[in-house]
Amino acid sequence: LSFPALPFFTAGLRPELFAGAGTQSAHRVLLVTALSVLVLAGFAFRANGLSSEGLSDDELNKLSAVNEYRTQGLTSANGEHPLLMKALLTVSVIAAEKWNQTSLVAGHPELNVPVETSLRFPVALFGAFAAVLIYLVAAELFGLETGLIAAALWAFDPLAIGFNRIAKEDTFLIFFFLLANFFWLRGQRVAESQPERNPERFYWATAAAFGAMLASKYVPMLIAITVSYNYAFQRIPVTRWVIGKKRFLKFFFVMGVVFLICNPTILLPGTWKAMSNFTSYRNMAHDSYEFMGGLYPHRFQDWFRGEPWYFYFALIATKLPVLSLFSFGLGLGLLFRRKSGDGRYFLLLWFSLWALSFMIPGGKFTRYLTSVLPAILITAAIGVQFAARRLGRLCARVFENESLKVYARAALASLVIISAFWSAARAAPHYRLYMSVLGGGHAKAGAYFPQDEFYDAYMQDVMIEIAKRARPDARVAGELPSLASYYAQRANRPDLACVEFSDPQELEKLVPGDFLIDARGRTYLNNQVMLARLRQVSQPVLTISVGSVPAAYVYVLDQTSLAALRGELQNRER
């Protein structure tokens, strides 16, 4: 962390804020070693205990798509999402199955790779390597020290780790976005400071990375961040970083070709039908989202009637380690100082355009923060570096020893990084349940964003316990019938009929001795009254926890609880 920063050139300003860092390059071996340690340590956090939590309903949809690809070839399965991630998941699942069939695993069953692990492994891998891309982007904008601090914060941040341990598209989205912008910013550097070189190869590499990004998740607005950053320099007379219309046309052509190569299922009619159903909410199973104890409509067009605009502010305030949060606040203020250099415009555009796209719509999920979390951590790294330099100068002045500067700077940066490491270590392996002291600590785990914090992690254990107790052909009611059925099959109880209890027809079919799952985060506007009535007249026979946090309550239904669910008790009282 005491490495001097790289020289920095953009179309305008040099970041005077960190000018004291010097312009020598760090020893390449030391730099590669530092990044390798961060990637390996970050991967260890992300990959350890991947099967400690059961699959979510979303992840089961991915597994179903993988199985369909294997039996039928490329289809429109899970077609509302692009192919690239599902293709990587398919490779991982097949590789794990081949591994599990080896004689080595036969003799050592503990080496067997569960499907939960194989499905999530590619996400964990890409999430760990994203630390390198964060370093590269931050180093281009603000220098080597900021890049290393930002990479370390990503490697050990509980939020980042939690998002990188679920089989969803957001990690791949941000990976390719970062890759694209590293090429884009390197092209800027070449255009401005090395006129003898042609920067075009960096533009085409950017376009290719964006094609892969869109083949990971359909979030084209992120491209606007990159293009807007270039546009911000076009009115500067001396700028050399000019793309031009012809090159932009070629840029989007390259992006489109790579997109089609990585996502050929976009050409299937069934894919467009699935996307239409998704965007029109015809496949939307649930009508709301629980946030801080309240239920909110959850559609995109609910706008300010949906989840509150401060949803992501609450997430950052309660889930970032305290020192990382304070560093982010300091760094955010520094982004409005001219001395921070032109790189600050990239982060400001990132924050602004992301906020317009994700904070105003009514439908929000915590994992959407993944696409702006690197910007938050880079900003935090700016704050750490600024404070560390101030501390270094203070120590040198107080003790009249210039050599103390380096040690003081390294000590403060290390303190912030170690605090993130410690937070992640304490939260393992249930990182999504991490709560900072400002959020109320572990006592408040699962209280603010229960659907995303638990993410159905309890369902495997729930069905194992029900399978032990249920009579033949019993019905199991809950809000996740497909997932319950999957784990019932895994528990050798294919006879169990798993149904959605908020469906009036299925509710009428329940009889005494059937089971009902009341899971945290799965209370909705259409079932909250029924669950409230059930809780008043009955007690769960089982409580399933994720770690030490109660996550789901299992009821064995009797005549009284069935009458409460159906509202018959209230009708009698009237």
Which residues are covered by each model-predicted region?
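Short acidic/glycine- and proline-prone juxtamembrane loop motifs at membrane-interface regions
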Residues: 56-57, 159, 165-172
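Transmembrane-helix motifs of polytopic, lipid-linked glycan transferases
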Residues: 113, 117, 121-141, 179, ...
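Membrane-interface transmembrane helices that cradle and orient dolichyl/undecaprenyl
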Residues: 139-141, 145, 180-203, 213, ...
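Transmembrane-lumen/periplasm boundary regions of multi-pass, lipid-linked membrane glycan transferases
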Residues: 45, 65-67, 81, 87-88, ...
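Short helix- or helix-capping micro-motifs
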Residues: 39-42, 150-155, 162, 182, ...
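Specific aromatic-rich, kink-prone transmembrane helix
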Residues: 133, 172-192, 205, 209-210, ...
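Transmembrane-helix signature of polytopic, membrane-embedded enzymes
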Residues: 101-110, 134-156, 175, 194-197, ...
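Aromatic/acidic, Gly/Pro-rich catalytic loop(s) in extracytoplasmic/lumenal soluble domains
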Residues: 497-574
